[in-house]
């Protein structure tokens, strides 16, 4: 915000946060928060009412990332669904799904697998609860060139966009970090 970024464009993307941080962000105009736990969701509802929330799901990164982060934060798909239903009941706006495939991920197809997990959450929420999500935060994980030759970030982005086009028939906003 101090750098001139509009608060409407900022996502509070950490699943571990203090109530005072949620309140501070909300008071500054931030209205998009990630969650992966009931207690955190309750905190968001209390200190950031009517905000949009997205849920971080656990995904497998396999052995193709140098630093697996896919299981460090997040919840399973059923808990993600339950949290989004609860969010709606608490006056929050269920908005999307987040995941991280691990840092220095060398296999672009891992994003496809993670996007399939996100799609399962999207579909079940819409079919069983009438909740239509709008966002996927696919985290980071893009490899940087060190010693080994790697595909360019543009190549990764093109493949991920193809996966999105294949899996999601309606408009979904995609965040990549």
Residue ranges and their predicted role:
Residues 1-135, 159, 163, 170:
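Active-site-proximal beta-alpha core segment in soluble small-molecule metabolic enzymes
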Residues 14, 176-177:
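Short loop/edge segments at beta-strand edges and connector loops
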Residues 71, 150-165, 173-176:
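Active-site loop ensemble at the mouth of alpha/beta enzyme cores that anchors a bound cofactor
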Residues 101-102, 136-146, 176:
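Glycine-rich beta-strand-to-loop/alpha-helix junction loops that act as flexible
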Residues 108-109, 146-151:
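Metal-dependent catalytic neighborhoods of phosphoester/phosphodiester hydrolases
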